């Protein structure tokens, strides 16, 4: 939107009695803003998504303990359920996390049951790289299309056939 934000984010700020002037946002294009993060003196850094190289992890760990993706789960492969589980562990409330996952899953099933046309419908979770001028699709290994499969949809055959173990595939 015109605030370089989203309408829902702006609405939540307003609900909290805040404005964009009350918050600080950091660009991540060149990696984490380590010095700025350190100034905030966080108790923990919650970073379950993204490209967490050993170098980035070390620098962040020098600032605060870092919660990353679960062991064995690649970057951008973390499901929303795993994010909630990691948050529950971090906060010392694993049972609350489990309850939230169960309640949300139930609500999703109830909501999607109203739309029988979703079951079995194919989808492509795509992206456009402006700099490279390429069009691609995230695969089932990536967390971004998981919402669609949670709704009962299936990955488009083209993506499945051309992706193998990749997280994304170029479309042509």
Question: Which residues does each predicted region cover?
Answer:
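A short, structured surface patch at a secondary-structure boundary
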Residues: 1-36
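Extracytoplasmic substrate-binding proteins
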Residues: 63-131
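Extracytoplasmic/secreted proteins, especially bacterial periplasmic and envelope-associated proteins
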Residues: 8, 32, 36, 55, ...
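Alpha-helical, coiled-coil/dimerization segments enriched in small aliphatic residues
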Residues: 137-169
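Short helix-initiation/N-cap motifs at beta->coil->alpha
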Residues: 26-33, 162-172
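Solvent-exposed loop/turn segments at secondary-structure junctions
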Residues: 3, 44, 50-53, 72-75, ...
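Proline-aspartate-enriched helix->loop->beta-strand connector
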Residues: 37, 41-47, 65, 172
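Short beta-strand and adjacent tight-turn residues that come in two discontinuous sequence segments
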Residues: 26-28, 47, 69
């Amino acid at each position: 939107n015109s605030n370089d934000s989203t309408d829902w984010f702006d609405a939540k700020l307003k609900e909290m009695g805040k404005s964009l002037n009350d918050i600080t946002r950091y660009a991540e294009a060149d990696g984490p803003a380590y010095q700025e993060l350190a100034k905030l003196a966080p108790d923990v850094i919650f970073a379950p998504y993204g490209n967490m190289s050993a170098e980035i992890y070390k620098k962040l760990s020098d600032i605060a303990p870092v919660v990353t993706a679960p062991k064995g789960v690649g970057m951008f492969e973390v499901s929303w359920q795993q994010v909630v589980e990691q948050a529950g562990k971090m906060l010392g409330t694993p049972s609350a996390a489990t309850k939230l996952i169960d309640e949300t899953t139930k609500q999703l099933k109830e909501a999607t049951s109203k739309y029988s046309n979703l079951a079995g419908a194919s989808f492509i979770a795509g992206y456009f790289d402006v700099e490279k001028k390429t069009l691609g699709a995230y695969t089932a290994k990536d967390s971004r299309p998981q919402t669609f499969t949670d709704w009962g949809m299936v990955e488009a055959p083209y993506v499945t056939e051309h992706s193998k173990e990749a997280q994304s595939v170029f479309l042509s």
